[in-house]
């Protein structure tokens, strides 16, 4: 199954070694029609800063596939009363973002922005704040969130975080970063594999599987304190944790009674309860947002396919029928769809299926994708794809129209998962 090894209920990837420091470069490609034409004018005063706020906002919005960026060459940010709306109308913009950056006496930076309706020539919203240089990127994501929500009526997901595993040389590191891969920091590092990270619903903890004890054990780690606890260390293999929507329970995969089966435990590791009963391998559980269903991968029918069963157990319903290899299901936050990996003509691609129509759509056309998960606003999907023998972070819009690649100069990135929406302070 091309580099995948079905082992103790886990799809364990055999990683290749890499070394040296990593740098990030964003590449966005693809796109469709019926997008909102928006111009993001260069912010006054941002030249010379280590990061361009207008460039970050532009990349955020373009990555969703819902916006068409209008050329701003030769035009700059101005105060609303000075703006020549006819110039922006001539370039096809229906919305315009302008802003300014200026230094403050205490060393911080004052950032201001406005979102304008080019057609009606009115201001839709505005925002300002004083930040440090290190906070510029987060503030730019906040601006993009405000623009996105104002124009679409949906919350933006640009201020969220992701988790992933990075292998460099013989070292495995569980890392957390901004949603676009920047500002990564390591939670733990070991010379043994770390796999299947899963965010708690409130974003305060991450469950994951570590092989540091020479066998797979499930841990839960608190991000703020870095304290962790082994919550599934039963006889045999313990793997593939998934949080219930209320954060009180975890679904895990154990070989406690022989084959790999799905169990429920409380978030502290107590209250073990067996859920699946099959002669095959059941693995990779995912809770439905309402907490009623578990979707999972099983080879009970002879090939890896995706099934769904009540969280209390019972009869499993097969969900995928196209092809002989469908794995790694992940529910959308609204519960209407699920995303997974589908083998297509020897390629492993991200696919999405509508639960009401059962229609499947391929979203990617690369060779080897894995670990898809939705953004918390349903609009984007995070996954890793293999290029040149190493995994890199990528996103695709949920309609498949816009793809974004975060290229790492070094390091092998796998097991990516998107975190929940965070409350704005």
UniProtKB/Swiss-Prot annotation:
Predominantly, its location class is periplasm
PANTHER family the record matches = PROTEIN TOLB, PROTEIN TOLB HOMOLOG
Could you tell me what this protein does?
Part of the Tol-Pal system, which plays a role in outer membrane invagination during cell division and is important for maintaining outer membrane integrity.
What species is this protein from? Nitrosomonas europaea (strain ATCC 19718 / CIP 103999 / KCTC 2705 / NBRC 14298)
- A GO biological process held by the record: protein import
Q: How does it assemble?
A: The Tol-Pal system is composed of five core proteins: the inner membrane proteins TolA, TolQ and TolR, the periplasmic protein TolB and the outer membrane protein Pal. They form a network linking the inner and outer membranes and the peptidoglycan layer.
Q: Which residues form the signal peptide?
A: 1-22
State what protein this is by name: Tol-Pal system protein TolB
Annotated keywords: Cell cycle, Cell division, Periplasm, Signal
Q: Which family does it belong to?
A: Belongs to the TolB family.
Q: Which InterPro entries match?
A: 6-blade_b-propeller_TolB-like (IPR011042), PD40 (IPR011659), Tol-Pal_TolB (IPR014167), TolB_N (IPR007195)
- What subcellular locations does the record give? Periplasm
Q: Which Pfam families match?
A: PD40 (PF07676), TolB_N (PF04052)
Annotated gene: tolB
């Amino acid at each position: 199954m091309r580099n995948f090894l079905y082992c103790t209920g886990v799809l364990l990837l055999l990683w290749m070694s890499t070394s040296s420091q990593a740098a990030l470069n964003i590449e966005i490609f693809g796109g469709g029609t019926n997008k909102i034409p928006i111009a993001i004018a260069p912010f006054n005063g941002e030249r010379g800063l280590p990061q361009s706020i207008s460039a970050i906002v532009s990349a955020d919005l373009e990555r969703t596939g819902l916006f068409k960026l209008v050329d701003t060459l030769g035009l700059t940010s101005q105060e609303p009363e000075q703006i020549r709306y006819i110039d922006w109308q001539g370039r096809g913009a229906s919305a315009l973002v302008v802003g300014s950056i200026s230094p403050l006496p205490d060393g911080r930076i004052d950032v201001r922005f406005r979102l304008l309706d080019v057609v009606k020539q009115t201001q839709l919203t505005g925002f300002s704040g004083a930040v440090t240089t290190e906070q510029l990127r987060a503030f730019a994501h906040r601006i993009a969130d405000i623009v996105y929500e104002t124009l679409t009526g949906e919350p933006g997901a640009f201020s969220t975080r992701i988790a992933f595993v990075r292998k460099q040389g013989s070292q495995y590191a569980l890392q957390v970063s901004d949603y676009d891969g920047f500002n990564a920091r390591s939670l733990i590092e070991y010379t043994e594999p770390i796999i299947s990270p899963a965010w708690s619903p409130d974003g305060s903890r991450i469950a994951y599987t570590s092989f540091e004890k020479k066998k797979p054990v499930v841990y839960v780690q608190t991000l703020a304190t870095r304290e962790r606890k082994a919550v599934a260390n039963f006889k045999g293999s313990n793997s593939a944790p998934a949080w219930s929507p209320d954060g009180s329970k975890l679904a895990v995969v154990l070989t406690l009674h022989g084959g790999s089966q799905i169990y429920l435990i409380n978030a502290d590791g107590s209250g073990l309860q067996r859920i699946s009963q099959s002669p095959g391998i059941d693995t990779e559980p995912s809770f439905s947002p309402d907490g009623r269903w578990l979707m999972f991968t099983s080879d009970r029918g002879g090939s890896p396919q995706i099934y769904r069963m009540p969280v209390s157990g019972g009869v499993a319903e097969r969900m995928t029928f196209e092809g002989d290899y469908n794995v790694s299901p992940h529910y959308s936050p609204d519960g209407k769809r699920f995303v997974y990996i589908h083998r297509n003509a020897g390629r492993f691609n991200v696919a999405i299926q509508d639960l009401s129509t059962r229609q499947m759509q391929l979203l990617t056309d690369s060779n080897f994708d894995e670990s898809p998960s939705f953004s918390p606003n349903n609009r984007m999907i995070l996954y890793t794809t293999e290029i040149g023998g190493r995994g890199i972070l990528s996103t695709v819009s949920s309609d498949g129209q816009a793809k974004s690649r975060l290229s790492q100069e070094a390091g092998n990135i796998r097991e990516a998962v998107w975190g929940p929406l965070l409350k704005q302070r």
